[in-house]
């Protein structure tokens, strides 16, 4: 039901409705779009960001946790892992594109160089309705997109150094095993600490990085019980990292 996976699904099924889940070889890249959050164009240092500033998302009204994740770009990191698993794609085929207008919800580039994109008003009712009415597209209460009013669309590369949470998510995706579960748990603890003004905005990735470095490697497929255990252990480890302040030594 999320707008980006829904957009990718629509692009894939438009090309091949029955075998979309087996199209990894025909896909060159997935362009996973992100609004960039409230700090996409901010030039000032992010170390001084307050919870109140980080909660001012320019496009979407969401809960506090996911709004902070959008500000750090971790939410897009989670979505990247989601896309890799949903559509059986390697990490190298998923590319993040900062798109402040949130008009293109994602796009698929095929091996021939053609790009299929799904566009629409930035309104979550659209993907939710499509999930309910699939495969039909029914009339919607959402206001139609006026391309003349939109006028222009912007696309920018993400800055992985300025937003290290995104880089950590891709590292966790490459490592696989227990790392994605640990990533999620550590982020949850770090964001909560930031909202309580216990750490700085730029400390969020440091906490996550410290936890990931202490997470044991694991080969093979992870079952639900193992993922749940990894989540619990990473949660406890993140709390310990906050208490002993070892995250302050992290160099990302």
Over which residues does each language-model region extend?
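Catalytic, metal-anchored helix/loop core of enzyme active sites in primary metabolism
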Residues: 1-252
């Amino acid at each position: 039901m999320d707008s980006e996976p829904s957009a990718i699904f629509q692009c894939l099924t438009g090309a091949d409705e029955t075998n979309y889940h087996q199209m990894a070889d025909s896909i060159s890249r997935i362009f996973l779009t992100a609004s960039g959050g409230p700090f996409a164009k901010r030039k000032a240092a992010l170390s001084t960001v307050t919870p109140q500033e980080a909660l001012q998302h320019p496009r979407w009204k969401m809960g506090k946790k996911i709004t902070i994740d959008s500000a750090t770009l971790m939410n897009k990191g989670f979505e990247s892992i989601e896309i890799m698993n949903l559509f059986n794609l390697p990490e190298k085929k998923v590319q993040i594109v900062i798109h402040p207008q949130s008009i293109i919800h994602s796009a698929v580039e095929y091996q021939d160089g053609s790009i299929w994109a799904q566009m629409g008003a930035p309104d979550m009712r659209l993907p939710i309705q499509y999930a309910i009415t699939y495969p039909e597209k029914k009339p919607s209460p959402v206001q139609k997109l006026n391309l003349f009013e939109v006028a222009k669309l912007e696309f920018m590369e993400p800055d992985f150094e300025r937003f290290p949470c995104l880089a950590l998510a891709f590292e966790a995706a490459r490592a696989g095993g227990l790392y994605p579960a640990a990533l999620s748990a550590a982020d949850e603890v770090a964001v909560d600490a930031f909202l309580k003004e216990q750490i700085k905005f730029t400390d969020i990735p440091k906490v996550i990085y410290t936890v990931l470095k202490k997470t044991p490697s694991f080969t093979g497929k992870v079952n639900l019980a193992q993922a749940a255990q990894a989540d619990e252990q990473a949660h406890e480890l993140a709390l310990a990292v906050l208490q002993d302040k070892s995250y302050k030594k992290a160099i990302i």
